[in-house]
Amino acid sequence: MDGFNPRATTVAEYMDGTPKFRTDLYASTCGQLLSHKEYMRVVDMYGLKFTPELKAPEVPMPFMGKYSQEQYAQQLIDEYRAARISPDRVFLQSFSIDDIYFWNRHDADYARQAMFLDSRPDTPEGARQATATMAQLKQSGIRTLSPAFHALLKLDAGNNIVPSDYAVAAKKAGIKLTTWSLERSGPLNKVRASGDFYYSSIAAAIKDDGDIYRVVDVLAQKVGVAGIFSDWPATVSFYANCFNL
């Protein structure tokens, strides 16, 4: 994960921004950033699946007046077609619903498993609106929603972690769910005091690191997510192996 020190007064201090619960052990090896095509070759070599996210541009589009958002979205698909990667192995992601609609119109075979990274429930009003419009969203062509996991969980009257109204509405509408990002929050005994984003809807029930398995269990067994993105694989892999998922 990228990190920075917002209180820095020098370049060195600015770069020394990795949270203490993460490590810079491997940062000194000067790893080389791969292109998307290079990433595809590595993943394909191991016979794995692909989960590319079409990142939001940091420049105005169309870039240089020529390269449009639609061309950007199409280029991603074109590279999978050129490499003859089966659509069944590709799980596209985007925070822009327009990207999902574009793929539905122009690349339906690759769009079937596309995930709309839904940031609407990051606010209470957004969550209410999203929950109320699930049926319309499904009718518009959205098959899989992927919000941060706080959006899929809430606490009941007994302080138990249960599926949120958003999660219940999505499943009722026939929309698949995935979620993110586990293992990004640091020590769980501090998430309530720190106002951690990911645990914001259930922080009152989180006491220590072992509670991560309660979260995973509710997501897997009660919410029924199809997958969980995690910054570290150990927790989800251990759980999946225990329950033969």
Curated annotation (Swiss-Prot):
Give the signal sequence positions.
none
Sorted UniProt keywords: Secreted
Could you tell me where this protein is found in the cell?
Secreted
Q: Which SUPFAM superfamilies match?
A: PLC-like phosphodiesterases
- Annotated coiled-coil segments of the chain: none
Q: Name one cellular component (GO) term.
A: extracellular region
The UniProt entry, under InterPro entries, shows: PLC-like_Pdiesterase_TIM-brl (IPR017946)
Under Gene Ontology molecular function, one entry of this record is: phosphoric diester hydrolase activity
- Keyword Secreted assigned to the entry: answer is yes
Q: What is its main location?
A: secreted
The processes (GO biological process) annotated in the record are: lipid metabolic process
Protein name listed in UniProt? Extracellular protein ARB_04177
Name the species this protein comes from: Arthroderma benhamiae (strain ATCC MYA-4681 / CBS 112371)
